Amino acid sequence: LRALAQAMASDPLVVDDLDLADIATVTRVEAALARSEVVLASASTEKVATTFRGAISTMREREALVVLWPGMRPADQAAGMSLRSVTDPRAMTLPGRGALVYRGTCLPIQIVLPRPEDNDRPIEHPV
């Protein structure tokens, strides 16, 4: 989330673990969404799949989603569509493996960590 926030032109509201956030944080997220501001948030796949109102639901309906481990059971429900086409059955739980879901389309992605000793360039591993 931090890397995405740094790449944004405006200052987004960044919330880690929105599903565990207090009411004040959730209220700030809902207000930012109502003003069409950029919000970057993370939440558990299970909670995203089973929440039908509030900030998590609004973001799931309107925004791009990054779903990690797209082959696991609640991922399709969280995304609102089948993620089978972007799931590698040989690497269901490979760290950082995911899907980018936006407006009815999905793309496979691989999230990587930056190398601190190398100006935050990503660590590249063959997959």
Map each language-model feature to its residues.
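Conserved P-loop NTPase "ATPase switch" module shared by AAA+ and STAND
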Residues: 1-26, 38-42
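Phosphate-binding and hydrolysis-coupling loops of NTP-dependent motor/remodeling domains
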Residues: 10, 42, 50-127
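Short acidic, S/G/P-rich loop/turn micro-motifs used as interaction or catalytic elements
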Residues: 18-25, 45-50, 72-74
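Structured helix-beta-strand junction loops
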Residues: 35-36, 62
